[in-house]
């Protein structure tokens, strides 16, 4: 009954207004209030500040500065080897596996469309049909920068306005098409395993999604899907390099072509992921 009420609340809640208001608060330089909120957040979610480059809550001028905090250089090691892909984030695997008949598994009784996830264009979705996916949830305590699993040249980006449902196991099990209806940014790279898509999915209280090449992404006045073509620009990011960040967090969906990679043997739904550790290996074709 409580779970049902929570889901009903998700539909009734003014999610975009709430996200805008909290986004403004998170961006405000509010002095002692900012420090107070950061300390409360650290205690509530058991955030490990020993890994942060700056561990003193008073160092951060805004809550966003704290939330997107940088790690110490030695805090994460990126797995070596050209054929090894690295975990792009700290988080936990929500679901992973094969893309079957153009659909990705969300939770028991729910799947969603690859085409819709990527903005509705067949040419964008086609390279990933019958491919593989991994959906990784970033909890409040996690490090909220997203890094490259493999060296890649940026080919295109798509920003898709949408809803801002909370993303967690409860909503995944009860909100149809959750990841294909929430606001999201899609970045597609050419890599040694073929095209790789990194989908950054927004959620309630996610004030913004940023990329290192375009900055903060926002919906235009008409709430239309926006496209950027980078094929003629040399924007190449090395494995382990930062590619984006959430100002307040959500989920990353990584997409790969058919027979391009094998996920790490110990990886499954529920697995904790740690930036830089083995995510997958390239399939060698004879």
Curated annotation (Swiss-Prot):
Record-annotated active site = 90, 147, 250
Q: Which cofactor does it need?
A: pyruvate
Alphabetical list of Pfam families matching this protein: PS_Dcarbxylase
Name the residues annotated as site: Cleavage (non-hydrolytic): 249-250
Q: Please provide, alphabetically and separated by semicolons, the GO molecular function terms listed in this UniProt record.
A: phosphatidylserine decarboxylase activity
Any one of the GO BP annotations:
phosphatidylethanolamine biosynthetic process
**Top class in the EC scheme:** lyase
Pathway entry: Phospholipid metabolism; phosphatidylethanolamine biosynthesis; phosphatidylethanolamine from CDP-diacylglycerol: step 2/2
The highest taxon in the source lineage is Bacteria
> What does the Swiss-Prot or TrEMBL cofactor note state?
Binds 1 pyruvoyl group covalently per subunit.
Q: Which reaction does it catalyse?
A: a 1,2-diacyl-sn-glycero-3-phospho-L-serine + H(+) = a 1,2-diacyl-sn-glycero-3-phosphoethanolamine + CO2
Alphabetical UniProt keywords: Cell membrane, Decarboxylase, Lipid biosynthesis, Lipid metabolism, Lyase, Membrane, Phospholipid biosynthesis, Phospholipid metabolism, Pyruvate, Zymogen
Q: How is it modified after translation?
A: Is synthesized initially as an inactive proenzyme. Formation of the active enzyme involves a self-maturation process in which the active site pyruvoyl group is generated from an internal serine residue via an autocatalytic post-translational modification. Two non-identical subunits are generated from the proenzyme in this reaction, and the pyruvate is formed at the N-terminus of the alpha chain, which is derived from the carboxyl end of the proenzyme.
Localisation per UniProt entry: Cell membrane
Q: Which residues carry this modification: Pyruvic acid (Ser)?
A: 250
Q: What is its EC number?
A: 4.1.1.65
Predominant place of localization: membrane
A Gene Ontology term for the protein's cellular component: plasma membrane
Membrane topology reported for the UniProt record: Peripheral membrane protein
What this protein is reported to do is described as: Catalyzes the formation of phosphatidylethanolamine (PtdEtn) from phosphatidylserine (PtdSer).
HAMAP family according to UniProt = PS_decarb_PSD_B_type1 (MF_00662)
The annotated subunit structure for this chain is: Heterodimer of a large membrane-associated beta subunit and a small pyruvoyl-containing alpha subunit.
Query: What name does UniProt use for this protein?
Result: Phosphatidylserine decarboxylase proenzyme
Q: Which organism is it from?
A: Psychromonas ingrahamii (strain DSM 17664 / CCUG 51855 / 37)
Species lineage: Bacteria, Pseudomonadati, Pseudomonadota, Gammaproteobacteria, Alteromonadales
